[in-house]
Amino acid sequence: MSGIPVDLKLEVVVLPVSDVDRSKRFYESLGWRVDADFPGVDGFRVVQMTPPGSPCSIHFGKKVTTAAPGSIKNLYLVVSDIEAARRDLAGRGADVSEAFHFEAFGGPRVPGPEPSGRSYGTYASFSDPDGNSWLLQEIKTRLPG
């Protein structure tokens, strides 16, 4: 074993959906790239899509997961400008929340951006047609590390 860990890059997150074609249309409308749409045996089908600028993709389909449709909550999408991201997604048909921040870690949501404007503090949210939920997190400057 060396002192340097191997690269472990998150590639795919699986989303449980009830209607594959509806989900594909929804994510396409948001500008996500269709990487694959493969049928398999016995009704299996997997769709892979990737958000603009992301190295990580999503999978959904038929017989892809046993999780209940809509059961995935708070997947993070990092953006550099929360208001620009909100406008873009809303213009593409997503029902995006107003910007909000948290009173404290684990605390309740508070309307409006994080008062100091610091990175990692301002959010907005939206859900897909099944209720899988996404958080937009504004990061202007990444913390070191």
Residue ranges and their predicted role:
Residues 19, 81, 128:
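Acidic di-acidic motifs
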Residues 5-8, 14-56, 84, 91:
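Core segments of cupin and vicinal oxygen chelate
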Residues 56-58, 134:
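Short beta-strand segments
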Residues 62-85:
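Helix-adjacent hinge/juxtasegments
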Residues 51, 60-62, 138:
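Residue-level recognition of conserved beta-strand positions in structured domain cores
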Residues 1-6, 12, 37-38, 45-47, ...:
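Vicinal oxygen chelate
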Residues 54, 63-65, 141:
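Residue-level signature for short turns and capping positions that connect secondary-structure elements
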Residues 1-3, 61-64:
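Short beta-strand/turn micro-motifs at beta-sheet edges
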